Regions:
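Surface-exposed extracellular loop regions of Gram-negative outer-membrane beta-barrel proteins
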Residues: 28-30, 83-90, 135, 155-198, ...
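Extracellular loop and loop/strand-boundary signature of outer-membrane beta-barrel proteins
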Residues: 1-7, 41-48, 56, 60, ...
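Outer membrane beta-barrel strand-and-loop segments of large Gram-negative receptors
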Residues: 54-56, 60, 99-112, 187, ...
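C-terminal beta-signal and adjacent terminal beta-strands/loops
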Residues: 271, 313, 325-347, 361-365, ...
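Gram-negative outer-membrane beta-barrel transporters
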Residues: 218-220, 241, 245-329
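Face-selective signature of the C-terminal outer-membrane beta-barrel domain
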Residues: 2-138, 151, 206, 210-213, ...
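Outer-membrane beta-barrel channels and translocator barrels
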Residues: 13-15, 62-68, 120-124, 151-155, ...
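Residues on the lipid-exposed face of transmembrane beta-strands in outer-membrane beta-barrel proteins
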Residues: 6-10, 57-63, 111-117, 146-150, ...
Length: 426
């Protein structure tokens, strides 16, 4: 994968400016799996090949009409090139079947206008609208957005915001093919997933270097792609592929509160503490509400760092940084042991009627870094030692059947990543 871009800003005068950006992103994924029988005969089980290239053009003009009225209007044009050929065997040692195939290009075009209006010295109103269309299937959306902020004291503010947002799915979803439909892409007419967002915000300036925010929110999703009469929803997608017919009949609901306490960098010290308490539910194709895969219920982060100026003239910098996370455990569905034993490949089967009803214990994750920066007149050298997931916290990847013990066990794995880096700036 890779990305690059260039940006240009032009000032017509003190009140009007135009910003234009050209960018390109590239992603390629190749994967194969081979299955073996008891005689060590092999057969291909999975063959995934897909690449996506996006050319993105964005331009926006910002105009300050007065001290209390500013407007920003812009467009984004994304040219999406795709090439995918994805095959999967229904069972081990069976011939692979085509599940998604497509090659070509399409366009995602969006435009927006947003205005900031100073109603008074304490109250600011932001209103706007966003529109977008996907030419692949002519799906379109018109999304009103508005927010109001009341600075009712020098240290305290209150804000309320509402907006409608829409998104397209990953490109492979639109080109799913099934054995019963032949070359027809069964999901090509899928519409956008849409959502209403409402957020409150209370901000309090504790001091010149410290700020606190409390932000309750509510999100209602609709037109979510799901499998009819099933608990499946794309909101829980974590596989590299989708192989089923989807319909825009699902829903989702997120409600929670975010609390943030932040000390800005001052005298070499900074820190931030965040706490999120939330509930995340989805409504599947079987018309039942359940926990989403991501409903951890809480996440607490503490991060901070300290910088010391050292050296003969105090021009060099030694720094220590850390991040600690405590979050609810991974969600999973109970294993259907009978169905697993009946499966010819002993592939673990789950009780999808109770999808994501189980939860592992909370997770404790730590990261830290130590750095030293040498500053010279025309060049600087920075050395750093970093460690990600220092505590070796294990993530959940599913369950597997152990043929030696005839037992089903969860697959857990920890990715701890220490590294040493050097950066040269001139």
């Amino acid at each position: 994968m890779g990305a690059g871009g260039i940006s240009h800003r032009y000032f017509f005068n003190n009140e009007t400016q135009l910003k234009t950006t050209l960018a390109v992103t590239y992603f390629k994924h190749e994967g194969t799996m081979t299955s073996y029988d008891w005689n060590l005969n092999s057969a291909p089980f999975l063959d995934l090949n897909r690449s996506n290239t996006n050319l993105i053009f964005t331009t926006a003009i910002t105009r300050k009409f007065s001290a209390k009225f500013t407007n920003k209007t812009g467009i984004t044009y994304t040219k999406m090139y795709y090439d995918m050929d994805m095959n999967l065997a229904p069972h081990q040692m069976h011939p692979m079947e085509l599940i998604s195939q497509g090659k070509g290009n399409t366009n995602l075009i969006s435009g927006y206008t947003s205005s900031s209006i100073g109603i008074s010295e304490q109250v600011t109103l932001n209103v706007g609208v966003n529109a977008q269309v996907l030419t692949l299937n002519n799906s379109w959306a018109l999304e009103p957005r508005a927010g109001i902020k009341w600075q009712f004291s020098p240290k305290s503010s209150f804000a309320l915001a509402y907006g409608v947002h829409s998104r397209m799915e990953k490109m492979d979803v639109y080109f799913v093919k099934t054995q019963g439909t032949g070359d027809r892409s069964v999901n090509k007419d899928l519409g956008f997933t849409r959502a209403h967002h409402v957020m409150l915000s209370y901000g309090f300036k504790i001091s010149d270097n410290m700020n606190m925010k409390i932000e309750p929110y509510f999100q209602q999703l609709y037109d979510v792609p799901v499998i009819a009469d099933s608990s499946y929803s794309v909101l829980n997608r974590r596989d590299f592929y989708v192989e089923n017919v989807l319909v825009n009949r699902g829903k989702g609901r997120n409600i929670g509160v975010d609390i943030t306490l932040e000390r800005y960098l001052n005298k070499g010290l900074y820190y931030m503490m965040t706490a999120s308490i939330f509930d995340s539910k989805y409504y599947g194709g079987d018309r039942k509400w359940r926990n989403t895969l991501y409903n951890r219920n809480f996440i607490v982060n503490v991060l901070g760092g300290k910088e010391w100026m050292v050296g003969r003239d105090k021009q060099n910098m030694f720094s220590v940084n850390f991040k600690i996370t405590l979050q609810g455990g991974d969600r999973y569905a109970p294993v259907d042991e009978v169905a697993t034993l009946l499966d010819p490949d002993r592939e673990v089967q789950y009780d999808e009627t109770k999808a994501f009803s189980k939860q592992f214990s909370p997770m404790f994750i730590t990261n830290f870094s130590v750095g030293y920066k040498i500053n010279r007149k025309k060049v600087s050298h920075e050395f750093a030692i970093k460690s990600l997931n220092t505590t070796g916290c294990e993530e959940y990847y599913g369950h597997e059947y152990n043929f030696k013990t005839d037992k089903i066990k969860p697959i857990r794995g920890a990715t701890s990543l220490p590294n040493v880096s050097y950066k040269l700036e001139f």
